[in-house]
Curated annotation (Swiss-Prot):
GO terms for biological process: cellular detoxification of aldehyde; glycine betaine biosynthetic process from choline. This is Aminoaldehyde dehydrogenase 2, peroxisomal. Its EC number is 1.2.1.-, 1.2.1.19. It is found in: Peroxisome. Expressed in leaves, flowers and fruits. The active site is at E260, C294. One of its GO terms (molecular function) is aminobutyraldehyde dehydrogenase (NAD+) activity. It comes from the Eukaryota. The record marks N162 as: Transition state stabilizer. A motif (Microbody targeting signal) lies at residues 501-503. It comes from Malus domestica. It catalyses: 4-aminobutanal + NAD(+) + H2O = 4-aminobutanoate + NADH + 2 H(+); 3-aminopropanal + NAD(+) + H2O = beta-alanine + NADH + 2 H(+). GO terms for cellular component: peroxisome.
Amino acid sequence: MAIQIPSRQLFIDGEWREPVLKKRIPIINPATEQIIGDIPAATAEDVEIAVEAARKALARNKGRDWALAPGAVRAKYLRAIAAKIAERKSEIAKLEAIDCGKPLDEAAWDIDDVSGCFEYYADLAEGLDAQQKTPISLPMEQFKSHVLKEPIGVVGLITPWNYPLLMATWKVAPALAAGCAAILKPSELASVTCLELADVCREVGLPPGVLNILTGLGHEAGAPLASHPHVDKIAFTGSTMTGSKIMTAAAQLVKPVSLELGGKSPIVVFDDVDIDKAAEWTAFGIFWTNGQICSATSRLIIHENIAAKFLDRLVQWCKNIKIADPLEEGCRLGPVVSGGQYEKILKFIATAKSEGARVLSGGARPEHLKKGFFIEPTIITDVTTSMQIWREEVFGPVLCVKTFSSEDEALELANDSHYGLGAAVISKDLERCERVSKALQAGIVWINCSQPCFCQAPWGGNKRSGFGRELGKWGLDNYLTVKQVTEYVSDDPWGWYKSPSKL
């Protein structure tokens, strides 16, 4: 039976609301290229209504309903959301798979992580209560001082299409835990599950206006959200180019932003590895989520002593990856998200060949799949560091390869990038791994693995991969401001000026 896409409206002030201009955007299943539904298209007019709803939510009952409520109150809602997501896991995972092309097993894993992330931030919300009025030791006895942690206000959350609900959760859960009111704008290429999050919030009775969800195009909904004077912060995950535009818009209002942007992450494989273990992690690091991961380890830097043997084995692993409709049992590589992304990736591969690189494996549509935006797992060798394929993010199932002869050369190649999100090193020599992990210019380093992610650990990059950290306690701090409160406690007058009474 075909999976039905629920027909939803925008979610504003706790209610479903038709877009002011009544526009909608078709949903295309990337595995079949068929239209399977549509989503509402918000514009600046809807952003205005959502911002007003969010500001009212913060001010309601002088803030006591949400922003100034005990963290334990907000935690109850977060736990209710987590439970409802877990209850609807199977249904939501299927919607995710047909909307963005992610293999169903991966989508189900994502939904588990969504539920776990809401639970985690429920715990941190409760912990906030104990952190209020933290005393500060001062050098002058006449004063005492403490710190308050307060929500930053109304936040705009702009999220990508590769992990539609999970990436939204990485922002929504800590923002709500902190006591902010949020406006979520997911990517127009994959918004279905974010609208289901709205339905979950409605079911659990989340106070109106605390979370508003606007689907729509970036220039029609995302841009007016980023530049709105009554939005106190923007958190964005997406391309470096769009991140730069958001920074520019926010700069006009001196508005804080946190950005998780592109990557061209390296995986360094030394010559002492177990070939099969290292080959599987190398494949997982680039072909998981159909290669559409900001942190994908898309540059393989392999020791020359084992390069030929390793690549032969890696090709065998790639040929064993089941490429299929995401709902098909055992699927491990689905289609990329859209026709535009499909064409862009094929152009990257063509340019690599024209610049002198060699496609060792893959590089085209799988022969057995005539429809859908499918691309084989692709390995490209004979790469130079000046080539586009080495320098630019592909965001697809494409791995480029270079060899090295020394640790210093490996590090030079690994750090030869404008990006600095993730990096991996694989070796049995753990002292070497520790040394290399310190030298890698990245916000996340994996040792003897690639891509594991836990909501307890910080996530974010350096260089053009952005700044700020999501997840863990760092993710909560993204949505909090710190207020110093200092009191004069001496009975004596301050005594700096001569008292008029003594003149």
